Design a protein with these regions (language model features):
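Solvent-exposed soluble domains appended to multi-pass membrane proteins
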Residues: 1-209
Length: 209
């Protein structure tokens, strides 16, 4: 499954990422990735975006700003979620778009959330707007967010044998639904050097037998 994802693995450098967040607190994964800082010295249960991000933070975004990049954060969520309105400002994104669906047409939803495909089409529009100049975009999508109990809306191309875990099956099929964007990424990276980083911060699935 995930043929486009595995094709990208063959054509590029791939690996695994370990994050402090487990089954939640995705804002902490964002913070650690974008700054290179660890949450290892903060109390358990901390949410750095809402509790500790009160000043400008140097990291990947500020470095790319210095190199002349347009740095853009795109979110389908409101500024209040994990206080990303303040967080993305402190992380020094030049351009910040919240509730991005307000700027889109032909919006599709799944499980009450805007679909990955809709977000990716919008990213493609932004990419084309910045063609010919250095561009960095950061987004966190919501299509594959928990709960994983809406099988009627999922195309079940991946099935399990002798393993009863409907939530895990739905989760994998949701990831499979995102493969359209991976095809798009393969297409836009053919003529220019591009760095694509993909990782997930997801709810832990209860083990079943």
């Amino acid at each position: 499954y995930l043929p486009n994802y595995h094709k990208l693995q063959e054509e590029s450098i791939s690996g695994y990422v370990s994050v402090s967040a487990y089954g939640g607190y995705s804002c902490n994964s964002e913070y650690e990735f974008l700054t290179g800082n660890t949450l290892g010295f903060l109390p358990s249960g901390s949410a750095v975006f809402t509790q500790y991000l009160n000043d400008k933070q140097n990291g990947l975004v500020s470095w790319l700003n210095e190199l002349g990049y347009t740095t853009q954060a795109i979110s389908p969520c409101s500024e209040g979620l994990w206080d990303i309105g303040n967080a993305y400002e402190q992380l020094q994104f030049k351009d910040r778009i919240y509730n991005c669906q307000d700027r889109m047409s032909d919006i599709q939803y799944f499980n009450g959330n805007i679909t990955d495909e809709t977000i990716f089409r919008y990213i493609e529009e932004q990419y084309e707007r910045h063609a010919g100049s250095p561009y960095f975009v950061w987004t966190a999508t919501m299509q594959n967010h928990a709960p994983y109990d809406h099988p009627e809306g999922v195309i079940h191309e991946i099935t399990f044998e002798d393993y009863n875990n409907p939530a895990a099956q739905e989760y994998l099929n949701l990831i499979s639904m995102a493969r359209t964007w991976l095809y798009f990424q393969r297409r836009i990276t053919q003529d220019f050097d591009r760095l694509l980083s993909l990782f997930g911060a997801t709810r832990a699935l209860k083990r079943r037998r």
